[in-house]
């Protein structure tokens, strides 16, 4: 489905009852073709969605609330457009469910169907809200660099690495990632973590490259995949992982993770800006 046909940027009618048809899938293939991915994926990973505005009624009509986390595999053929996800979750508000498990099962079934792959779902109930963590992405901050920047569309030529020197292992972070919704033009603010093993990447060039997304239009997942591929092609690391955490909109935050080597799932602790 085309993003222009999604609920984004259109007048909204909020459903009063649960409605799975509100979910609007968008194929990943189109955006991947634009960055040269036409066959096997050069990465694997997950999109971590956190939903903070989920509520439903129990069997006796009493409202219940939870924080939901969805783990969408990067190999799924579709993503779900975020406003449609918000409207879908909102449709639970006046619908009765017998248990938390019943809600989880419905969420897993519907979102998996929309994405075209098995999606894991976790629900955190209010008595466990205090266990939810807040933390910043770990790594050496690129934002410490005092530099000039004047490129605000993605430019891979800003990236370079010392290929004639000994390889290094580094984790680098920046809070200066900003892109824009391809439908509404609204800004998407994010933090990004880049872990790699290979020729040392020029830090100033990498920061300028991250800044260059400032006027770019693309969904969160697409931006992270572009960053991953550009670093992979320009800097030639042996191992590479890119993880971004975007600020919340409509009660949802989206946190794409891409890697080309086996490692544990990244921490889902929300950052201060989320």
Curated annotation (Swiss-Prot):
Keywords on record: Cytoplasm, NADP, Oxidoreductase, Queuosine biosynthesis
Gene Ontology cellular component terms for the protein in this record: cytoplasm
Main location: cytoplasm
Enzyme class: oxidoreductase
Free-text function comment from the UniProt entry: Catalyzes the NADPH-dependent reduction of 7-cyano-7-deazaguanine (preQ0) to 7-aminomethyl-7-deazaguanine (preQ1).
UniProt: NADPH binding residues: 82-83, 249-250
Catalytic activity field: 7-aminomethyl-7-carbaguanine + 2 NADP(+) = 7-cyano-7-deazaguanine + 2 NADPH + 3 H(+)
One of the protein's GO biological processes: queuosine biosynthetic process
Biological source species: Burkholderia multivorans (strain ATCC 17616 / 249)
Quaternary context: Homodimer.
Protein name stated in the entry: NADPH-dependent 7-cyano-7-deazaguanine reductase
Pfam families per record: QueF, QueF_N
Family statement: Belongs to the GTP cyclohydrolase I family. QueF type 2 subfamily.
Pathway: tRNA modification; tRNA-queuosine biosynthesis
EC code: 1.7.1.13
Gene3D superfamilies, per database record: 3.30.1130.10
UniProt keyword Mitochondrion present: no
Phosphoprotein among keywords: no
Domain of life: Bacteria
UniProt-recorded Gene Ontology molecular function terms: preQ1 synthase activity
Localization per record: Cytoplasm
Active site (catalytic residues): 181 (thioimide intermediate), 188 (proton donor)
Binding-site residues, substrate: 80-82, 220-221
Coiled coil stretches, renumbered: none
């Amino acid at each position: 489905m085309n993003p222009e046909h999604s609920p984004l940027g259109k007048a909204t009618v909020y459903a009063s009852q649960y409605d799975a048809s509100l979910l609007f899938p968008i194929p990943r293939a189109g955006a991947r073709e634009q960055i040269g991915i036409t066959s096997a994926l050069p990465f694997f990973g997950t999109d971590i969605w956190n939903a903070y505005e989920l509520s439903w009624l129990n069997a006796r009509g009493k409202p219940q609330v939870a924080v939901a986390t969805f783990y969408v595999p990067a190999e799924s053929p579709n993503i779900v457009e975020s406003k449609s996800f918000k409207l879908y979750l909102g449709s639970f508000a006046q619908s009765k469910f017998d248990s938390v498990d019943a809600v989880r099962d419905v969420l897993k079934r519907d979102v998996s169907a929309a994405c075209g792959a098995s999606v894991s779902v976790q629900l955190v109930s209010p008595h466990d809200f205090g266990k939810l963590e807040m933390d910043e992405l770990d790594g050496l901050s690129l934002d410490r660099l005092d530099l000039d920047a004047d490129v605000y569309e993605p430019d891979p030529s800003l990236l370079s690495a010392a290929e004639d020197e000994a390889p290094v292992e580094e984790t680098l972070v920046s809070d200066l990632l900003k892109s824009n919704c391809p439908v509404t033009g609204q800004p998407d603010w994010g933090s990004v973590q880049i872990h790699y093993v290979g020729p040392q990447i020029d830090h100033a060039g990498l920061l300028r490259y991250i800044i260059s997304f400032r006027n770019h239009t693309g969904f969160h997942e697409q931006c992270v995949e572009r960053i991953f591929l550009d670093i992979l092609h320009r800097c030639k690391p042996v191992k590479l992982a890119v993880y971004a955490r975007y600020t919340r909109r409509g009660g949802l935050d989206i946190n794409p993770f891409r890697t080309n080597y086996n490692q544990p799932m990244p921490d889902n602790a929300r950052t201060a800006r989320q």
